[in-house]
Structures are given as structure tokens and as C-alpha cells.
Amino acid sequence: GLTILLLLILTLVIGGTVIYFRPSLLKNLLSHVQVSSQVSSATKLSSSKSSELTSSDSDLPKVSSADWNLVLVNRDNLQEEKMPSLTQVGEIRVDSRISENTRQFLAAAQTIAPGEILISGYRSRAEQEELYNENVAAEEAKGLSHEEAVSAVQKQIQIPGASEHQTGLAIDMSVPEGLEDELAAKIAQLAPQYGFVLRYPEGKSNITGVDFEHWHYRYVGVENAQYMQKHNLVLEEYIALLKAAEK
């Protein structure tokens, strides 16, 4: 209706016809035109933002936070003693479902660091407890109090039940001395191609509760790993994102 009215006015003006509008009517008309323009612009902007949000949401993998390869294990989520089906890969054992990916990841890492080997895989709760206690004792032998020793050890070694090694989904890799930072960064970069992520990266210890470890990798699946790398997420953050999307 407004568009037709404006066209009619324009036609009459061009035709030489003089039209008189009361000031109040003219003011209302111009105000209506201005508001309509603003609404149209706002609608376009809102539509654009909505499209961006939808695009961002659609980037999130269509997976469940409860998937076996996304099990979250940390001090707030202790792992029950479970014995997964294991397969030997080199000198370690891993969950049989990730054995082939582990072999491929190791082979790729060896193209960067030929001396690369796997030094740890599945570890039972009892083995984790023994490792933990040994390290606490070693710190106490340096003169630390028990509390100080526990605090120091827990920055890199998980308490029994909080270690991902119990799942068979975590591996520790070696890196030849002297080239640790350079080689470790390259290996971490290619890890998602095989479904692995560097579990405890720099700058995330306030979330993971563990200091930076360039050797500890966790299998989460290729799609999940690539998304986590792209968005700089650790597993705790990724799980929270998935759970929010599931609500």
C-alpha cells in the first residue's frame, strides 16, 4: 500500500499536478517510510546473523557425547576398572578398535622423527597406582613434604581412576632429544588425520588439570579430532559443546 501511494505521488508530480498534504500527514508518511527502511535493514542483518550461526552450528560433528571414543576421564570423571579388548601395536597394547589408526599414526610420525616409538598404551588401574605412588615417593626423596610431592606429581601423572591409559584409547610417544619442540609440534599437527589429538596442550592446563605434555595423545575419531584442532578445543570443552547441542 505504501509503495503504491509513493508511486502515485511521484506520477502526479511528474505530470505537473500539485498535491497539498497537511504537515502532520506528510510527517507521518515520511516517518513510515523511514521506519520501513530500518525494519527492512534490520531484517536483512538478522537473517545474515542467523545464517552465520546456523553455518557455525552445522560445523559441529553429528556425534553423541556418549560415544565410546569420547569417554571423558579426568579427576572429576573417574574411570571404573574395565578391561577393553586389546591389540598389540609395537611394544604397547591399545583398544583393538584403534589399533590400525595407531599403526598409521606411528608410521606418519616416523616420517618426521625416524626414531619415534610408542612408549605407553593401555595401563591397568593397579599399574597406574604403582606408577603414581613411585613418583610421589621420588618427589618426597627430594625433600618435599607429602602434600608438596602429591601436588607436583599430579601436574603430570593422574591419580588411579583418572588416567586415560585405563581406557586403551591413549598413547604416549617418544621424541628424540634435542628436537623435542620442533618435532612434537609437527607430529601434533598431523595427529587428527588419524583420529588423535594432543590431549594436554599448552595453555589449557586450567581446564584439563594437567600441564603441557607433548607426548600424550588421545584417540577421539578423525571427525572429532579435526574439529577439535580447528577450534582449538580440549576434550572437556568439546564434550561440553556437544552436550549443549544435545539439549
What annotation goes with each model-predicted range?
Residues G1-K247:
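Extracytoplasmic cell-surface/polysaccharide-interacting catalytic and binding patches
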